[in-house]
Amino acid sequence: MIHAGNQKITNKEQSPRVGELRGELRRKMAAHTPNAGAHATAIPGLTLYHRTAPSPCYPAMFEPSLNVFVQGRKRITFAGMTYLCDQSTFLLSSIDVPVVSQIIAASEDVPLLSLLLKLDMAVVREILSQEEFHAPDGSSPARGIAIGKTTVDLLQPFCRLLDLLDASEDIPFLSNLIQREIVYRLLRGPQGERLRAIATLGDQSHRTAKAIAWLRANYTKPLRVEELAEIARMGMSTLHHHFRALTAMSPLQYQKQLRLVAARERMLVEGIDAASAAFEVGYESASQFNREQALLRSTADAGHQSASARRLRNGQRLTTLQIVLSRWTRKLSRNASANGLPGSLHRLKAKQLKPGRRSLTS
């Protein structure tokens, strides 16, 4: 096992077959994304993304979905946490999550390629009813977004799903089967508990998800937390606790981010100005919209700077460790020479920790 952050990477994730499957996905996507942009497909819930340039930070909304990255790099900021996504990762969203997104590595020659598959929670519940999974204990609700390592078991059904784009007559029957397999693999994987908790009727996370869904549908209305607690059938303090555990923000903060995303979409799609978009999504003034948009950008920048600072601190700790080890081995070597001990101690220098050989969490 290789440790990467808090995740264990298995042999399946490191096997040459993973690289072969990524290559297959790149070739299949190239055939179905002739130009840059988001490409909806004939398969319900599946969208292919092809981006050819880095982007500034922008607010976005993730629905319950699985986003598999095939090439390029993207940075997702969620409540001050930064998730770096590349060809070895997938991003799982188990609820509606407002994020700040930024493409950080993409070009004409090496575009960012990713597949987004929306998750049908009814299908998740159906699979849970047919198979035995460890029930979520509900003691520590997980965040509504998580990053994981792509495996052979996950990439294979995606390859077969893209094959259906060349056999449209098979899509109505086979696409449902393949999507069920993908959901099954997710439920069996390290991030499966997130989906199980959201989908389990009566679970606190499931009740909180109902409140989140209501907010998503009614974000333009004034927020009454008492009404939200009634919808979730929870006490107000309990709702606040579980809401923050899933989204890392309060219901009011969540509503603000929903409005920011909706306003941006109106400006891009409908071509309206910022003031009109702000009023349409529930802001009382354009200045309020501008303030919150600036705050969102600064929060995303702070999250990125915090992650960079952690990497710098880790590098500084590694340098200090190298100095200590170097001094220690020189001392041992001198003692060995003075006492006529075997020359093997002199070879300790060759075993000093070298830059780049580390497994520190960045």
Stretches found by the model and what they are:
Residues 38-135, 320:
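N-terminal regulatory/effector-sensing and dimerization cores
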Residues 269, 280, 287-348, 352, ...:
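…primarily DNA-binding HTH/wHTH and HhH modules…
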Residues 181, 185-191, 198-204, 216-218, ...:
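Basic/polar phosphate-binding segments, predominantly the helix-turn-helix DNA-binding elements
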Residues 75, 222, 271-272:
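Residue at a beta-strand N-cap/secondary-structure junction
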